Swiss-Prot record:
Gene Ontology terms: cellular component: germinal vesicle; nucleolus; nucleus; Pwp2p-containing subcomplex of 90S preribosome; small nuclear ribonucleoprotein complex; small-subunit processome
A Pfam family recorded for this sequence: WD40
Name of this chain's protein: U3 small nucleolar RNA-associated protein 18 homolog
Subcellular localization, as worded in the UniProt entry: Nucleus, Nucleolus
Subunit structure: Component of U3 snoRNP complex.
Phosphoserine: residues carrying this PTM: S102, S104, S164, S165
Superkingdom in the source lineage: Eukaryota
Length: 506
């Protein structure tokens, strides 16, 4: 059909519509129609609604005009308004969400195919049998209930185009709380669970002397006085054995994994130590240089280049990790009990059998500073937090002092920020977790003598350990790289393992 013919047809329709409208206005507002009313006896047999013949043949006047307009390919100006009046609850096409799928059977299904007159429903003459059943249900639902807000399509802003996938998830999944994801570690109660022992696959190490988690893999190294070191997979359920390293007539007093994760060092009371290549599974026996007679207590620097070890009569030896070369020897008052590295590998803090703590400067190869541990008579252990803000010292009297690391250089008798007196026997070991939010303290002289402290509140968890928890005599502890696990080395065969549920990953 050409455009000229369409325009002519539209003009005829408009004139026809105006004529019909004038006739409608001239008619009275209400026309009384005479209707045959059957008797009561005939009412049951007759069950119909009388419809004018002109409506049956041609439909409503407005519908007739609409159909005529469609036949000439044009749309009346007020069609949209009429559709909105007929379906007030129906959303605009632009506001409608795109259906995830469409079923052609739903479009073909009509009301007459579903709705059948029964003795319960009565006559259904008020329904249009040729109407789509889908539209019928939609209109019925919208009449009963308004569309909920969550079903309304929101207008997308230009600023939301760069929203990350995480924000998309948080916006669509309502039960995820952004604040809960970034919440702080609870300071009153700790959510934990004791899982299977770390060395449950063998229990062959004897009295465990040291534990260390691998820095990059989900594995842990357990060494004992039987001269056996085992690497276990850490999952909290099976904890399968991955590899064994046996050293004949060499009781393992201390073992450490290098920060690179490819090499491990094992020391004892012998005048030599072992370096083990974890990738090639090869061991190297190295003789201690100089006058060194044992290596039963040592630590590897965070950079992996140096090893500091305790000697006789307060001697502190500094070795190279690769070449086994003695770089320097320091001397302090009293027997060396413990030491810890600074994160930049430039300082070593050492505690001894006296009340003094020494700070060694590796650049100048001298003792940079000495201060007295407040209230301490005999020192036992020392640990510097990973964030370099807190320094924890443990004494033989069972007291744990917490210092501000920067403030210890300003005085020879600094005052601690916090003092823990929850344990009554010598503090054997101190360990901070990776985020410096937890401090684990233990004593090997009493059963189940270990506690966890929360920072920055500086409070001790009252529910850890549990009231009837049996762990044994704890000699040392270790956190996994992301603090999800906490393991204890004991004087027995077991290495208890705890899962800290607040921390995710490994």
């Amino acid at each position: 059909m050409s455009s000229d013919e369409s325009s002519d047809g539209l003009e005829e329709l408009q004139s026809l519509k105006a004529l019909y409208g004038q006739q409608e206005q001239e008619k009275p507002a209400k026309i009384k129609r005479e209707r045959y009313i059957p008797k009561a006896s005939q009412a049951k047999e007759l069950n119909y609604v009388e419809v004018p013949m002109e409506k049956v043949l041609f439909g409503d006047r407005q519908r007739l005009l609409t159909n005529l307009a469609k036949s000439v390919g044009q749309k009346l100006p007020n069609d949209d308004e009429d559709e909105q009046e007929e379906n007030p609850g129906q959303a605009k096409p632009g506001d409608k969400r795109k259906a995830a799928w469409s079923d052609s059977d739903d479009e073909d299904l009509q009301v007459g195919d579903v709705k059948k007159a029964t003795k319960h429903t009565g006559p259904l003459n008020h329904l249009r049998k040729d109407k789509s059943y889908k539209e019928y249900l939609t209109a019925r639902f919208q009449r009963t209930l308004n569309q909920p807000k969550w079903a309304e399509k929101k207008v997308k802003n230009e600023d939301d185009e760069d929203v990350s996938s995480d924000e998309e998830l948080l916006r669509t999944v309502g039960f995820i709380d952004r604040k809960a994801r970034n919440s702080d570690l609870p300071q009153k109660t700790l959510n934990f669970k004791r899982v299977k022992d770390l060395n449950r696959a063998t229990y062959a190490e004897g009295n465990a002397t040291s534990i260390q988690f691998h820095p990059t893999s989900t594995a842990a190294l357990v060494a004992g006085m039987n001269g056996l070191a085992t690497i276990y997979a850490v999952d909290g359920q099976k904890n399968e054995r991955l590899h064994n390293m046996r050293f004949k007539k060499f009781p393992l007093a201390c073992s450490r994994i290098a920060p690179c994760g490819t090499r491990a060092f094992f020391g004892s009371v012998k005048p030599f130590y072992y370096s083990y290549d974890l990738l090639e599974a090869k061991e190297s026996k190295l003789k201690l240089p100089g006058a060194m007679e044992f290596m039963h207590r040592f630590e590897v620097s965070p950079c992996g280049k140096f090893i500091v070890t305790a000697g006789k009569f307060g001697a502190i030896h500094l070795l190279t990790a690769k070449t086994n070369e003695l770089l320097h020897s320091f001397k302090q008052e009293g027997k060396v009990k413990g030491f810890t590295w600074s994160s930049d590998s430039k300082r070593i803090l050492v505690c001894g059998s006296t009340s003094n703590v020494s700070v060694l400067n590796l650049r100048q190869n001298l003792i940079e500073h000495i201060f007295m541990d407040d209230g301490c008579i005999h020192g036992e252990s020392i640990q510097l937090s990973p964030n370099q803000r807190l320094l924890a010292t443990g004494s033989q009297e069972g007291v744990v002092n917490i210092y501000d690391y920067e403030s210890i250089f300003a005085s020879k008798a600094p005052q601690p920020e916090k003092r823990f007196m929850n344990l009554r026997t010598a503090i054997t070991d101190l360990q901070f977790n990776h985020s410096s939010e937890l401090l684990a303290m233990c004593s090997s002289e009493a059963p189940n003598a270990f506690k966890l402290a929360h920072f920055p509140s500086a409070t001790v968890y009252s529910n850890f350990p549990a009231q009837n928890e049996k762990v044994g005599f704890v000699t040392s502890m270790a956190f996994s790289p992301h603090s999800s696990f906490l393991a204890f080395a004991t004087k027995g065969k077991q290495v208890p393992l705890f899962r800290l549920k607040y921390f995710k990953g490994y």
